[in-house]
């Protein structure tokens, strides 16, 4: 059995390992969206009322703001995408919405309107 020299082994607080651990929830959320886009979405049909589609919006929101913030943004978007709901171009915000913190997650989402301020 080979032993790995101590200078090659990852230390306990290695920055690369820490960053990988912090990206794990984000990547798991994006993986779920990828699975939906390649399995269920083709069966149901591509019929989103917004541009970009809700799954593309969710993927971008989670990539930009993490699973917690991006997940709340995606939930708000899915709730707006219904009959008699909003439609049109609705991009992911560039910056985090004002007042959005981890303990006030509802502030991440735009619950009414498209591109509302």
Swiss-Prot record:
Its main location: membrane. Pfam families: YidD. One of its GO terms (cellular component) is plasma membrane. InterPro entries: Membr_insert_effic_factor_YidD (IPR002696). Keywords: Cell inner membrane, Cell membrane, Membrane. The keyword Cell inner membrane applies. It is found in: Cell inner membrane. It is a peripheral membrane protein. The keyword Membrane applies. Could be involved in insertion of integral membrane proteins into the membrane. Belongs to the UPF0161 family. This is Putative membrane protein insertion efficiency factor. It comes from Nitrobacter winogradskyi (strain ATCC 25391 / DSM 10237 / CIP 104748 / NCIMB 11846 / Nb-255).
């Amino acid at each position: 059995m080979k032993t790995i020299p101590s200078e090659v082994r990852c230390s306990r607080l290695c920055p690369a390992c820490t960053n990988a651990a912090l990206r794990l929830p984000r990547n798991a959320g994006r993986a779920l969206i990828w699975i939906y886009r390649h399995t269920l979405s083709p069966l149901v049909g591509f019929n989103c009322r917004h541009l970009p589609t809700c799954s593309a919006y969710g993927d971008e929101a989670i990539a930009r703001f993490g699973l917690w913030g991006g997940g709340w943004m995606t939930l708000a978007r899915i709730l707006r995408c219904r009959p008699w709901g909003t439609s049109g171009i609705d991009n992911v915000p560039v910056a985090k919405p004002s007042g959005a913190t981890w303990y006030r997650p509802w502030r991440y989402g735009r619950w009414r309107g498209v591109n509302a301020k």
